[in-house]
């Protein structure tokens, strides 16, 4: 179960260890005639008592045409050192920059010869550079967490007190800026008593006007301007004396006619 029908050589019967010249000739002749093909079936078709992985490595690293074996020059060694500082232990990439050299041969030459010549600090340089780049990346990805405000405090009373305490204007000018409402806002009038003691028909007759609501056009300060003294104190026991004449009232009412 699980074994291929075309496999005629058992695992116990496979040859292990070094390749002989006869095995090299069989493998070279078969691949030259039929091509590489599928490495798992190639040993049985070529008549070799080897596994597919062993045949592949023997061909790629030793028997393939154009391969250089041994005698690595000083220029190649210098190039291997520079590429190793840049790429690290990526032997297949380093072998691609050296025509005719295999990754297995370059790795063996590095571990057996070049690594012992170089100081330890230079051989560990790629790891240190990689560690520093990781630290820089860790610093870049740090982000601040936004804080969400759920409550808002209003200090309107405190701001008004501070504004009034730090305002350079005098008290009278501040009251004038507020529209003069503070001068009349503190006074309380008994209009029923004023109407009973003073005769407003002597001043003007609002019933005879056809212009609508005239009182909406005239403020209380204008109507009672002559009744209230400048100090804001009203003496209700003082008899009323009219300052207007009949002719002045007619001229004044004529201005409000529609």
UniProtKB/Swiss-Prot annotation:
Domain annotation HTH myb-type: ranges: 11-63, 64-118
Superkingdom to which the source organism belongs: Eukaryota
Principal place of residence: nucleus
MF (Gene Ontology): ATP binding; DNA binding; DNA-binding transcription factor activity
Residues that, per the record, bind ATP: 47-54
Protein purpose: Transcription activator, when associated with BHLH2/EGL3/MYC146, BHLH12/MYC1, or BHLH42/TT8. Involved in the control of flavonoid late metabolism in developing siliques. Plays a key role in determining the tissue-specific activation of leucoanthocyanidin reductase (BANYULS).
Note: TT2 activity is tightly linked to the presence of TT8.
Protein name (Swiss-Prot/TrEMBL): Transcription factor TT2
UniProt organism field: Arabidopsis thaliana (Mouse-ear cress)
Lineage: Eukaryota, Viridiplantae, Streptophyta, Embryophyta, Tracheophyta
């Amino acid at each position: 179960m699980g074994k291929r029908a075309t496999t005629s050589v058992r695992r116990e019967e496979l040859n292990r260890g070094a390749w002989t010249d006869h095995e090299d000739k069989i493998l070279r002749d078969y691949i030259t005639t039929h091509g590489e093909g599928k490495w798992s079936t190639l040993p049985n078709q070529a008549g070799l008592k080897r596994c597919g992985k062993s045949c592949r490595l023997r061909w790629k690293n030793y028997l393939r045409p154009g391969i250089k074996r041994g005698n690595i020059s000083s220029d190649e060694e210098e190039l291997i050192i520079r590429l190793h500082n840049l790429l690290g232990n990526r032997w297949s990439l380093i072998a691609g920059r050296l025509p005719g050299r295999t990754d297995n041969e370059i790795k063996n030459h590095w571990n057996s010869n070049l690594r012992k010549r170089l100081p330890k600090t230079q051989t560990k340089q790629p790891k240190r550079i990689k560690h520093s780049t990781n630290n820089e990346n860790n610093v870049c990805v740090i982000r601040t967490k936004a804080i969400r405000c759920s409550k808002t405090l209003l200090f309107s009373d405190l701001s008004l007190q501070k504004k009034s305490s730090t305002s350079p204007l005098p008290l009278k000018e501040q009251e004038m800026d507020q529209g003069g409402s503070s001068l009349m806002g503190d006074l309380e009038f008994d209009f029923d008593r004023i109407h009973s003691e003073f005769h407003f028909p002597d001043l003007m007759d609002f019933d005879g006007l056809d212009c609508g609501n005239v009182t909406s056009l005239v403020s209380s300060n204008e109507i009672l301007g002559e009744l209230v003294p400048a100090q804001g104190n009203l003496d209700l026991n003082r008899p009323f004396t009219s300052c207007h004449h009949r002719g002045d009232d007619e001229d004044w009412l004529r201005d409000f006619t529609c």
